[in-house]
């Protein structure tokens, strides 16, 4: 049972603060890797997820990339941290949370690209100027912010 599942047994749907990490991975054509997720509703998003007890944010990002894409991310560099009232959400099951999202960029990666079928439908690289329409809003904002800084 994950940390969040265990926590929810005690607090129910009450708002909690959850810490997670996302990772930007680019191919040789400078396209970003996105996954079409099963939840929420087949939207596209960046590889990433919630921190488990005892993990560093960097370890979380690397673990999630490996689990969701089959790739080993290397040379992670901090891009930005997103937090505050703009990062409040309520999941489909009614769980309320404030997300603290730590965004990394992988300078290199290796392995065979393959999606984990319980969490994602497919993986694909997209140009930053041609992101899919149906995308997790906060992930689109993160990529827009990143694109403006580059």
What are these regions (language model features)?
Residues 18, 27, 39-41, 46, ...:
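Short connector loops at helix/strand junctions that flank enzyme active sites
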Residues 22-24, 31-32, 103-105:
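Residues embedded in well-ordered beta-strands
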Residues 24-26, 79:
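Conserved positions in beta-strands of structured domains
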Residues 27-68:
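Conserved Nudix-box catalytic region and its N-terminal flanking loop in Nudix hydrolases
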Residues 140-150:
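Charged phosphate-binding loop/patch that engages nucleotide di/tri-phosphates or the phosphate backbone
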